[in-house]
């Protein structure tokens, strides 16, 4: 799966047979992002929450993948929620772009897939936003936690969902279950 890692190893293995300028050209072609992703994807796959699964539509493009979260507790238990994760060229100075592809009734995810998760913010006044020390593992664990301990009704992106929960928790649960049946199986 890590074909980029294989390419990096091949490139490193033939260094001695190339001229210095050719080696430098080869090193420049492999972006900092891609070098980081080889390591981070391996770490991610080794430390994936049991409720998550990653899928790389093109194994040569580690900067684009899908994440499926299947919560085993909370309102969202029994659902399968798909996320699209795209890692920009400026990674790790900027966070990955994440979108929820599954329609969901959630206070921190809009029905159109926008996500409110502090570590995905490029600039954050409270210090919980993106930092170059964060990794894809942090992103995946954060998305997974949106269905459990990071489920936040007090600072919602989807205000209507948060107000619905405040007004009638049973009806909120029913709507979540309806969305799971219709969109998240």
Curated annotation (Swiss-Prot):
ATP-binding recorded as keyword: yes
Any GO BP: protein neddylation
GO molecular function, one term: NEDD8 conjugating enzyme activity
Enzyme class: transferase
Active site: 116 (glycyl thioester intermediate)
This protein's pathway: Protein modification; protein neddylation
Entry keywords, A to Z: ATP-binding, Nucleotide-binding, Transferase, Ubl conjugation pathway
CDD domains: UBCc_UBE2F_UBE2M
Region (Interaction with uba3): 1-29
EC number per UniProt: 2.3.2.34
Region feature Disordered, mapped onto this chain: 1-21
Matches recorded under InterPro entries: UBQ-conjugat_E2_core, UBQ-conjugating_AS, UBQ-conjugating_enzyme/RWD
Cited SMART domains: UBCc
Catalytic activity: [E1 NEDD8-activating enzyme]-S-[NEDD8 protein]-yl-L-cysteine + [E2 NEDD8-conjugating enzyme]-L-cysteine = [E1 NEDD8-activating enzyme]-L-cysteine + [E2 NEDD8-conjugating enzyme]-S-[NEDD8-protein]-yl-L-cysteine
Cross-referenced Pfam families: UQ_con (PF00179)
Positions of the UBC core domain: 32-185
Role summary: Accepts the ubiquitin-like protein NEDD8 from the UBA3-NAE1 E1 complex and catalyzes its covalent attachment to other proteins. Together with the E3 ubiquitin ligase rnf7/rbx2, specifically neddylates cullin-5 (cul5). Does not neddylate cul1, cul2, cul3, cul4a or cul4b.
Family as reported in the entry's similarity comment: Belongs to the ubiquitin-conjugating enzyme family. UBE2F subfamily.
Listed name of the protein: NEDD8-conjugating enzyme UBE2F
Native source species: Xenopus laevis
Protein's gene: ube2f
